[in-house]
């Protein structure tokens, strides 16, 4: 991987930190959260890239929005990222920088999220289950 991306996302804004293969910070940005802004920023990063975002309300949306723009996409368990969670207050940039360093080093724990087909299958199964309980 040429570049590693850590994404700290909220409903209003997102902060993104980028490091190279040596762990040196090569860029960061903060923007309003929108599909257009996320795609624009991630697409502008050159080279093979991987992205990590912590599990949260927007994680599945981020996956569906960005996974085709990166070579590796990971949603990780925030409880396992003790360097971030045990540090007390972290501003968004510090959180994104710590996340990307953990991701680059292989210290994050991935959480599986379904793709579009998997989501449709899950909805169908849950609908069937609900109908069979009646």
What is each model feature region?
Residues 1-134:
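Phosphate- and other anionic-substrate recognition elements at nucleic-acid/protein interfaces
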């Amino acid at each position: 991987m040429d570049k590693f991306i850590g994404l700290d996302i909220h409903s209003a804004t997102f902060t993104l930190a980028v490091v190279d293969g040596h762990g040196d910070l090569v860029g960061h940005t903060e923007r309003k959260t929108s599909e257009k802004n996320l795609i624009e920023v991630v697409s502008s990063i050159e080279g093979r890239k991987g992205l990590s975002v912590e599990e949260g309300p927007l994680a599945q949306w981020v996956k569906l929005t960005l996974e085709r723009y990166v070579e590796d996409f990971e949603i990780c368990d925030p409880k396992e990222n003790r360097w971030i969670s045990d540090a007390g207050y972290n501003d968004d940039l510090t959180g994104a920088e710590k996340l990307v360093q953990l991701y680059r080093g292989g210290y994050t724990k991935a959480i599986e999220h379904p793709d579009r087909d998997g989501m449709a299958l899950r909805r169908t199964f849950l609908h069937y289950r609900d109908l069979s309980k009646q």
